[in-house]
Amino acid sequence: VIPVYNEGANFPALWSEMTEHLDFPFTAFVSYDFDGDDTLPVAQQIIAQGETRLKLIKNTYGRGVVGAIRTGFDAAPPGPVLVVMADLSDDLGQVRRMLELYRQGSHIVVGSRYMKGGRLIGGPWFKQLLSRLSGLTLCWFRGIPTHDATNAFKIYDRAMLGDIRIESQGGFELSLEITVKAFLAGYTISETPSTWRDRTAGTSRFKLWKWLPHYLKWYFMAFQPKSRNRHVREELRPT
């Protein structure tokens, strides 16, 4: 699942990286907000050249990255669902290892910047600080088995995604919400080292101060007692 917002400058390089590192069958769902997105003609040109693994899907939840990712989740078939940013920040060389952990029974596999062997290169220092602190404290003090709960670069089990009650409204809070709720509901989480690099083209839409209250909501939720019924969709709860 690839949420995009005017990533035309980055998409050719992203697709090249994907075809280099993902040497197994996959379908890439490019989820966009509006028909004028400059990613679309670039992706359409790749499709016109005979590429059948690339699918364009329009956000059905309302504009924004949360809706774009959820639209991709809805389109994804059963099995592992990988979320990849289009800004070339994610370490696609780690996907095979992430898939190995998924096949060993993990419901979420995190590409972790903050575990031993992981790296974060570039980006605003204060954003880095908050991200690192939240990931490490959730691991050390709550026992969530990843050092990087906030990273969007994750593999999710599609069936688990269908169980979790998603409430995120905006920003990249979605990845933290799902991780926290999956942990509290008893799903298995694992991680592997990953390198994150700040974008070199295009404009980031990350709005720290606007989205921080949403992150804090899920951060503090993590310290609640574990309870599957509280965090899965209502129709899945026992009557």
Placement of each model-derived feature along the sequence:
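Conserved sequence signature across two-component system core domains
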Residues: 4, 31-33, 59
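Short, well-formed alpha-helical segments that are part of the catalytic scaffolds
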Residues: 7-20
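Conserved donor nucleotide-binding strand/loop of the catalytic core
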Residues: 26-29, 40-75
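A conserved acidic beta->alpha catalytic loop
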Residues: 32-41, 88
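Terminal low-complexity segments of carbohydrate-biosynthetic enzymes
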Residues: 42, 104, 217-239
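Acceptor/aglycone-binding surface of glycosyltransferases and processive sugar-polymer synthases
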Residues: 57-75, 80, 92-172, 198-209, ...
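Acidic donor-binding loop at a coil-to-helix junction in glycosyltransferase catalytic cores
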Residues: 172-178
